[in-house]
């Protein structure tokens, strides 16, 4: 797999104009990026990046939201994000061990055309198993119960209230 990094200074976010220049210079299939980098507190301007990606309709977006999922608004469908990945750790404040994802129909269609997808992270395999009420592998049942508890806490607080609380906490430390 060939990958071309878009280098930025440590702690700086991706400049959407730099991304546009890079995408215009080649034949790209996918853009992957970390939305929020916890080690330095940098958050990429995701909406503006997605605005750029709309100009390149053949490019699929895969966004790591492990430390931003549920704490800032990420309107996946409105912004045209193809794949959101997160984990149970960090923003969901759970032990590590669960991978969570949301996949657009466009990304599913791209996966159908992709040979050698493997098994472990094959979204098509997950979708097929989900349709049968199954999982593709042995699930970590205690973490699924913990996720249910965590999601209920988020819904009880209210998603918008959670976003506002995290924004207030962010302002206290920055």
Predicted features along the sequence, with ranges:
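Conserved active-site segment immediately N-terminal to the catalytic lysine
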Residues: 77-89
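Active-site C-terminal subdomain of aminotransferase-like
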Residues: 89-172
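Active-site cofactor/substrate anionic-group-binding motifs, chiefly glycine-
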Residues: 1-14
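General beta-strand structural signal in soluble alpha/beta enzymes
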Residues: 4-6, 32-33, 61-65, 84-87, ...
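Short coil/turn connectors at secondary-structure junctions
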Residues: 1-2, 26-29, 56-58, 79-81, ...
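Short, well-ordered, mixed-charge alpha-helical segments that flank or form enzyme active sites
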Residues: 12-16, 38-43, 69-73, 78, ...
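Active-site phosphate-binding strand-loop segment of PLP-dependent enzymes
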Residues: 13-68
């Amino acid at each position: 797999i060939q990958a071309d990094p878009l280098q930025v200074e440590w702690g700086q976010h991706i400049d959407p104009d730099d991304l546009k220049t890079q995408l215009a210079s080649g034949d790209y299939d996918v853009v992957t990026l970390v939305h929020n980098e916890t080690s330095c507190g940098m958050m990429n301007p995701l909406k503006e990046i997605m605005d750029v990606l709309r100009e390149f309709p053949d490019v699929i977006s895969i966004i790591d939201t492990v430390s931003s999922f549920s704490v800032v608004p990420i309107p996946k469908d409105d912004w045209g994000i193809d794949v959101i990945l997160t984990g149970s750790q960090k923003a969901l404040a759970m032990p590590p061990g669960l991978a969570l994802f949301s996949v657009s129909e466009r990304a599913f269609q791209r996966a159908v055309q992709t040979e050698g997808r493997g098994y472990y992270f094959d979204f098509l395999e997950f979708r097929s198993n989900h349709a049968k009420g199954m999982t593709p592998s042995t699930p970590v049942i205690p973490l699924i119960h913990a996720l249910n508890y965590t999601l209920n806490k988020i819904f009880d607080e209210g998603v918008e209230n959670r976003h506002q609380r995290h924004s207030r906490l962010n302002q206290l430390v920055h």
